Amino acid sequence: MHGIAVIELKGYREWTESLGPRREHIIQQIQAKLHATLWKSFTTVGALPHHFRYDFFIALVNNISSAAVESAVAKIARHSPVPIDFCIGTGDTPYSAYLNCRGKEVEATSFSIVAHMDIVNSTKTTKLNGPLDVYSHIVRLIDTLLDVCKEYGCLVFYLGGDNTALFLPTPDVINEIVRNIDTRVRVGVGVAKKPYNAFVKATRGLDYLRSTNREGIKIVK
């Protein structure tokens, strides 16, 4: 079973509106602090988070105790302008675990499988056409991946640049995902007990493909 934690900033929209129309610089600074705390607190316990919508955060929490998740959430709460709540869901896939997110005492024991994907030749394209061209490409790619992931049970998130992260149900699923997109990509896939270790392995696989100037998939177990 895979585990997903969803963290909610309750009353966040109302808080933003209370700041008045000259508020966006305040909101962005608060979001940056919460983002930094999210990554520090969750990766410290071995989980893999993402800022998601900023009023909601998400994390892969396979083999992370509910107590450790609660402790990470508490650290974020210290910097939040509104109360924070969370749930943990489990399922046969990361996507089903997300849909099942209700309780707080649930723990998942499956190995974590994470992919780190980038677009082939994005650096060259950026030099030729500027950063907006690659940015628009990655937005379209993520839109496609979101639809594909619903079918295969994965979750996808934008990391910045031309990089995306995917929480996968099995290592082999990445083959089907790549077949369903029309973009040349490199993908490192990591398998480990804890999610952040899986992501580190995925990045190692991606770095190997980059250093050898290859595209395709590299699985690191």
Swiss-Prot record:
Cited Gene3D superfamilies: 3.30.70.270, Nucleotide cyclase
Signal peptide as annotated in the record: none
Name assigned to this protein: GTP cyclohydrolase III
Which InterPro entries does the record cross-reference, listed alphabetically? GTP_CycHdrlase_3, Nucleotide_cyclase, Rev_trsase/Diguanyl_cyclase
Its function, per the record, reads:
Catalyzes the formation of 2-amino-5-formylamino-6-ribofuranosylamino-4(3H)-pyrimidinone ribonucleotide monophosphate and inorganic phosphate from GTP. Also has an independent pyrophosphate phosphohydrolase activity.
Family as reported in the entry's similarity comment: Belongs to the archaeal-type GTP cyclohydrolase family.
Name the GO terms of the biological process aspect: biosynthetic process
Alphabetical list of HAMAP family matching this protein = GTP_cyclohydro_3 (MF_00608)
Q: Does the keyword GTP-binding apply?
A: yes
Q: Which keywords does this Swiss-Prot/TrEMBL entry list?
A: GTP-binding, Hydrolase, Nucleotide-binding
The catalysed reaction is: GTP + 3 H2O = 2-amino-5-formylamino-6-(5-phospho-D-ribosylamino)pyrimidin-4(3H)-one + 2 phosphate + 2 H(+)
Give the E.C. number(s).
Answer: 3.5.4.29
Q: Name the enzyme's class.
A: hydrolase
**GO MF term list:** GTP binding; GTP cyclohydrolase IIa activity
- State the organism named in the record: Pyrobaculum islandicum (strain DSM 4184 / JCM 9189 / GEO3)
